[in-house]
Structures are given as C-alpha cells and as structure tokens.
Amino acid sequence: MKLYEQALWFAGVTVEEKRFMSENQSSAPIAENKMGTMPVGKLVFNMSLPMMISMLVQALYNIVDSIFVAKLSENALTAVSLAFPLQTLLIAVATGTGVGMNALLSKSLGERNFKKANKIADNAAFIYAISYIVFLILGFTIVKPFYASQIGNADVEIMNLGIDYLSTVMIFSFGLFTQIFFERLLTSTGRTIFSMTSQLCGAITNIILDPIMIFGLLGFPKMGVTGAAVATVIGQCVAGIVAGTCNHKYNHEVSLSFKGFRPDISLIGHIYAVGIPSIIMQSIGSIMTYSMNRILIEFSSTATAVFGVYFKLQSFFFMPVFGLNNGITPIIAYNYGAQQRKRMIRTIKISLTTAFCLTFIGFLCFEGIPQVLLGMFNASADMLKIGVPALRIIGIHYLIAWFCIIAGTVFQALGKAVFSMIVSIMRQLVVLIPAAYILSKIGGLHVVWWSFPIAEVISFIASMAFLIRIYKTIISKIPEGKL
C-alpha cells in the first residue's frame, strides 16, 4: 500500500459508510482530500489539536497522581517513581502491538478486504489477551525482585509500598490492554475523536478517584499508595469500556467475532513484525529509567524521587509535542506520496516552530520556578536542595529537544524509522547512561544531571545529520507542487 494511502486511512479521510461495503467491492477513485488541499497551518491545527489535548490530559493525570502520592510521604513518591520502568514496559507492549495491528488493518481496509481486517482484529485481541496473562503472572512473581534489584533490602518501607503499587497495576492491567486495543481499532478507521474521548474519560476518572482512594474520602477506606494504583486501573477500565462502546456503535468497518476462532500464526507474525520495533523503541525508556534509578539510589532515595518528579513534569511539556507528531505524520506522509514538496516543508516548519514554543515554556518553568514545581510534590528541604539545581540543569536540554522530536517524526513519515531508532538508542542508552555513570564517579550528584544536556546535544547533531541527508536524497528531489 502506498505511503499516502496509509496516511489517508490514519487520518480517516477515505472511510466510507457501511452501506457501501462488501467483501469484494473495489475501491473507488480517491478524490483530492484535505491533506492535499487545506491550508497547511489550518490542517496541522485540525489534525494535531485533538491528540495534543488528549496527551496533555494524560500527562496531567500522571502528575496529579504523583502529587497526591507525595502528600503521603517522600518514600511513597520514591516507591511510585521506582515502578516507572516496568510500567513503561507494560505500556510499550500494549501500544507497540497496537502499531502492528494498525499497520495491517490500514492496508486491508485500503484494499477493501474487510474479511481479512476482521481476522486481523480477532488475532490482535488474542495477542492482547495473552499479553495480559503474561503481565498478570509477572505481577505475582517479578515485582519484589525488581524493587530489590534497584534498592536492595535497605529500605523496607519503600519496597513494601512499591510492591503494593506495582503489583496492583500489573495484576489488573486488563483495563489498559482493553483500552489500547479498542482505541487502536478506532484510530485505524480514522475515528480519532472517539479515541480521544475514551482517553479523557479514563483520565478524568483517575483524577477524581485519586484523592478518594488514597486518603479515604466519601466513606472509602484509606488505601494510600495502593489507592493510587486502584484509581489508575479503574480509570483504564472506564476508558476501555468507553472505547469498546464507541467501536460497537460507530466502527462499522471492523467487527469482532470469535465464533470458531483459531489463532492465525502467520497474521500474528505479521503483527509482531511491525509491532516489535515499536515495542523495542518504547522499551528503551524503561531500560534508561531503570539504569538511572540504579545510579541515583547510590546517592539517596531522595535523588530517585527527584528523578521521578522530573519525568512527570517532562511528560507535561513533551506530551503535547508528541500529540503534534501524531497529527503531522500522516500530513507529511500523504504529501510525500502526492509529490507536494512545498506542503511537506511548510508542515515541517510549522511543526518545528510549534514544538519550540511548547518546549521553551518548559525551559522557562524549569529555570524560573523549580521551587514551585517541586513544591507541588510536597518537597522536603532535602528534596528542594537536590531538585532545584537538578531541574535547572536538566531543563537546558529543552532548548534543543524540540528539534530532535520533530526530526524523528519526519524520519518515520518518510519511511526512515531506523534513523529515529538510532537517535533514540544513542540518546538514552549509548550516551546518557554511560555519561551519568562516569559523572557519578568523578563528581557529586549535581554533576550527574549534566548527562541529560550532553545526551541531547549528541542527539541534536545526529538528528541534524540525518535530516540533511533525507533532504538531499528525498525531499529535494520531490517536485515543488502547490502550497
């Protein structure tokens, strides 16, 4: 399937009504659509805003979750922060599998092979069920060794709090897998508004339940850190129910039927062929946070808590940029296929400007009001002493991170995802972790934080080199076209 045709399906501009569908129906000619005709600025806004809002709300509820946990104690905040690597892995498996499912679904829908599309959805549901069973087992078996590998047995309170939190999240992760499965089905047919709606419902549910479950309000028992986990999984279940309902009512292109179902090993293999690279890409963050926790815990548990707070705050400023990415990917891909260089370049320029503005706000906050940011998490005097310089040092990388993020999106949209993978691995594993380890040995804790700007500078250089290469070999050879 051509790249611009896939982009059309992700954007939902070629989805026809159910009454026109039949298994053997040939595809009608594709008329000019908004991605080739709408003014680029308006198009980027329309395509990106829903995902930006959705991801901003997701980031907000992650922050609110930690703010409430921090009111319990610094140890509680540290325990939740240490859970991040496995939580990241959990999300990576769910979303990466969804990427593989979406790719095959989009191709089958573009070919108007609805029988195959339904079969892909059935097999993807089977994969999600098996994935949940795996994490269910891990939730009972691996959580304690996981915490012990990061902090040893020195701090029993942190370990016990962490085990309660992470076990709950993993054992009841069926809500997360259900949510992402149905949201990806909606996305594959262009119904992103319903995907956003389900995410908002889940996030709002989580935000409302957090204080109730954690502090025992409205007659509920005080559950502490476990309450935060319970609120999270209930929010995921609500999002899954909403997404499933929207699929049943509005997604007429894909239907699920498990009557006489047998797993198709070939289809499952194709789903993973596309999904595993995405899982690996997202899992890099899991390895990075685990390794950083190991380095920082050598100084103090407070240092680990500061790192956890930084990650929550970073998500708030970066998630809207990632939402922008989701919006511009099909625009760039479509206009690449349609040979419209002016529209491609205009899209990239608008995206770079928007991403810079968003991350510059983060830079100003990290440099100007770190005490306020840390104060939201009930920071102790020790946490402020460590956290204020840490946020100011790490915040420097916001000045160039915007470029690396958008460049990675351009690579993926033009079919050069390997460049994104190289830059991501370079930033998070090849440079960041070794730099942090070396700096931890030759200087104090405040020196370790410089590993983040160092890694970003190297990533910036690599991204620039790859982008120049892509411009010379691909973009410059495309006809200018109309704007």
Kindly give the residue locations of the regions a language model identified.
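Small-residue-rich hydrophobic transmembrane alpha-helices
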Residues: L77-I137, L176-S195, V306-L364, G368-P370, ...
